[in-house]
From Swiss-Prot:
The modification Pyruvic acid (Ser) is found at residue 113. Binds 1 pyruvoyl group covalently per subunit. The record marks 112-113 as: Cleavage (non-hydrolytic). Its cofactor is pyruvate. This is S-adenosylmethionine decarboxylase proenzyme. Catalyzes the decarboxylation of S-adenosylmethionine to S-adenosylmethioninamine (dcAdoMet), the propylamine donor required for the synthesis of the polyamines spermine and spermidine from the diamine putrescine. Belongs to the prokaryotic AdoMetDC family. Type 2 subfamily. Is synthesized initially as an inactive proenzyme. Formation of the active enzyme involves a self-maturation process in which the active site pyruvoyl group is generated from an internal serine residue via an autocatalytic post-translational modification. Two non-identical subunits are generated from the proenzyme in this reaction, and the pyruvate is formed at the N-terminus of the alpha chain, which is derived from the carboxyl end of the proenzyme. GO terms for molecular function: adenosylmethionine decarboxylase activity. Keywords: Autocatalytic cleavage, Decarboxylase, Lyase, Polyamine biosynthesis, Pyruvate, S-adenosyl-L-methionine, Schiff base, Spermidine biosynthesis, Zymogen. Its EC number is 4.1.1.50.
């Protein structure tokens, strides 16, 4: 087993894991399309997202400093959680009656680790294809690794397409003063995915090793049309219509996966 790196002072590396998670469905009528947006807004409201992110905090072994959350009109929600490595206990100055902190004291809190999530439901104006996007950032300072949250978040949002970016910034010093720009071995984000996740997705990497920048795109392999239908479309489609909708949904997924418009 490789011995731990002995550091001089605090581990100053910042590790950031960013997700763009997409869930696709087909809603045939305007009524169903509106119902889909309302469904997403209710299932993934700020309160539910807070519970999910709180689980992430537990998984990566961090402690919550502060939570800010908001539901938006007409759609979408966001949550931001400030976290730290160590448990936070109130100091005497926080408990006693005294003047509030100076601005520089408040800013000191803002450079702590954080987790954010934003949701973006949207619907194609003609084809009835509905896309639910979730953007998640897990940024940590010190020894806490955001990579521990990978599998949980991918499965929690029943992801059809996932774009994952991981980067390490800054440097830390060992006891001899030598700089270390990364403190763990990694050649692909896929190394940190569970076997069932790797087997379930088609994946491609674009990695810039010298910049400690890693990028993985994931597309769900198994396609069952019934998993992508919402409202009347679950029972009203003819065999021919099912073929057409299958083509539409797969085309949408490929465009998102490759990040460009693809000719039909």
């Amino acid at each position: 087993m490789k011995s731990k790196l002995k550091l001089h002072g605090f581990n100053n590396l910042t590790k950031t894991l960013s997700f763009n998670i997409y869930d696709i469905c087909y809603a045939e009528t305007p009524q169903d399309q509106q119902a889909y947006v309302e469904y997403i807004n209710s299932v993934y409201d700020a309160e539910r997202l807070t519970r999910i992110l709180t689980d992430v905090v537990d998984i990566i072994g961090a402690n919550i400093l502060n939570i800010a959350r908001q539901d938006y009109d007409p759609q979408g929600a966001s949550v931001t959680i400030l976290i730290s490595e160590q448990p936070v206990t109130p100091t005497e100055s926080q408990i006693e009656e005294s003047p509030g902190p100076l601005p520089e004291t408040i800013l000191a809190h803002l450079d702590k680790s954080h987790i954010t999530v934003h949701t973006y439901p949207e619907i194609h104006p003609v084809d009835g294809i509905a896309t639910f996007r979730v953007d998640i950032d897990v940024s940590t300072c010190g020894v806490i690794s955001p990579l521990k949250a990978l599998n949980y978040l991918i499965h929690k949002f029943e992801s059809d397409i996932v774009t994952v970016d991981y980067r390490v910034r800054g440097f830390t010093r060992d006891v001899e003063g030598k700089k270390h720009f990364i403190d763990h071995e990694i050649n692909s984000i896929q190394n940190y995915l569970s076997e069932d996740t790797r087997n379930g997705y088609q994946m491609t990497d674009v990695n810039v090793y010298q910049e400690n920048l890693f990028h993985t795109k994931m597309l769900l392999k198994q396609f069952e049309l019934d998993n992508y239908l919402f409202g009347d479309a679950t029972s009203n489609l003819s065999a021919e219509q099912r073929e057409q909708v299958t083509a539409k949904v797969k085309h949408e997924m490929l465009e998102i996966f490759y990040g460009r418009n693809v000719a039909v």
